[in-house]
Amino acid sequence: MQRSPPGYGAQDDPPARRDCAWAPGHGAAADTRGLAAGPAALAAPAAPASPPSPQRSPPRSPEPGRYGLSPAGRGERQAADESRIRRPMNAFMVWAKDERKRLAQQNPDLHNAVLSKMLGKAWKELNAAEKRPFVEEAERLRVQHLRDHPNYKYRPRRKKQARKARRLEPGLLLPGLAPPQPPPEPFPAASGSARAFRELPPLGAEFDGLGLPTPERSPLDGLEPGEAAFFPPPAAPEDCALRPFRAPYAPTELSRDPGGCYGAPLAEALRTAPPAAPLAGLYYGTLGTPGPYPGPLSPPPEAPPLESAEPLGPAADLWADVDLTEFDQYLNCSRTRPDAPGLPYHVALAKLGPRAMSCPEESSLISALSDASSAVYYSACISG
């Protein structure tokens, strides 16, 4: 890195001003003169001889006749207004010229507008004979005006813009606009949720950023597109239809008939059930057809645990928690309704197949259907 010389970058002495008498301009002689002058010269230095600054003249007024600000221009304008060619008077103006003066002298306190109304009313009351001299005078003035001003053309004055451009008041609206009205209330005044519902804003852009509540997961979400949904079959009035899954019931009602079809025969049939895979299509083909029943969808019933049957994949671990009495409320091995009043849960097995079946065949079919439905239902729930 190179170093600059000591004198480089130092501030030079300011140049001597030529307009000052005390500035050194002639070498050392000027310095010696200043020192020889003594303290008196230092005490009273000479005043700097600055050039005389030009004096500011007062602002001149604009040229006369320019921008229309001169009095002469205003006078000329007034003279032009007064000297402009006026229209010739009609008969009413000729008559009202003298009549107005007479009414003004008789009624000095009346306004000019009131006098004009009085003159107009009085002119209409005159008959044609009384108006004739004024009509002739107006015709003479028109002919004289035409002679004096042959190139005259009537140019009506423009109306003031203030009358056309009326300012809108804060409460004044345009003709095509209507004041905003609150939406009608379809419900009467109520407390709680009803009032909150009525106070909600209308559906529109306010709901774009809001999300609707997510519904609970349905058992049908796990079904494949090709699989059929489960719908309960229509039931006759004398038969009890399938109840919703885990419907509320009294546990004591299921134990009133221990010797009926809810007991050992159904459990024995479930223990000796054949493989369930071939009968899965039969279960969904027979019971999976949608009917006119408008009620909610119900998942397939659960199956009790099997003792000697082969486990059906990961669903076999869940069968140990299934209660046998909970599954018995959905199936009934008898075709007729029992006489016991405490058994309201029955299903007519005559509607499960196209032909009549005996009791052993019904038991085996019931067990096969229960195994197939349980396997498909649990596999769909686990995979979903």
From Swiss-Prot:
InterPro entries: HMG_box_dom (IPR009071), HMG_box_dom_sf (IPR036910), Sox7/17/18_central (IPR033392), Sox_C (IPR021934), SRY-related_HMG-box_TF-like (IPR050140). It is found in: Nucleus. GO terms for molecular function: DNA-binding transcription activator activity, RNA polymerase II-specific; DNA-binding transcription factor activity, RNA polymerase II-specific; RNA polymerase II cis-regulatory region sequence-specific DNA binding; sequence-specific double-stranded DNA binding; transcription cis-regulatory region binding. One of its GO terms (cellular component) is transcription regulator complex. Keywords: Activator, Disease variant, DNA-binding, Hypotrichosis, Nucleus, Phosphoprotein, Transcription, Transcription regulation. Residues 85-153 bind DNA. Gene3D superfamilies: High mobility group box domain. Residues 1-88, 146-218, 293-312 are annotated as: Disordered. The modification Phosphoserine is found at S70. Residues 74-85 have a biased composition (Basic and acidic residues). The keyword Transcription regulation applies. Residues 34-47 have a biased composition (Low complexity). Residues 263-383 form the Sox C-terminal domain. Residues 87-100, 111-123 are annotated as: Interaction with DNA. Residues 166-231 are annotated as: Important for transcriptional activation. Residues 152-166 have a biased composition (Basic residues). CDD domains: HMG-box_SoxF_SOX18. Detected in heart, lung, placenta, skeletal muscle, liver, kidney, spleen, prostate, ovary, msosmall intestine and colon. One of its GO terms (biological process) is hair cycle process. Its main location: nucleus. A motif (9aaTAD) lies at residues 325-333. It is linked to Hypotrichosis-lymphedema-telangiectasia syndrome: A syndrome characterized by absent eyebrows and eyelashes, lymphatic edemas of the inferior members or eyelids, and peripheral vein anomalies. Transcriptional activator that binds to the consensus sequence 5'-AACAAAG-3' in the promoter of target genes and plays an essential role in embryonic cardiovascular development and lymphangiogenesis. Activates transcription of PROX1 and other genes coding for lymphatic endothelial markers. Plays an essential role in triggering the differentiation of lymph vessels, but is not required for the maintenance of differentiated lymphatic endothelial cells. Plays an important role in postnatal angiogenesis, where it is functionally redundant with SOX17. Binds target DNA via the HMG box domain. The 9aaTAD motif is a transactivation domain present in a large number of yeast and animal transcription factors. Interacts (via C-terminus) with MEF2C (via MADS box). This is Transcription factor SOX-18.
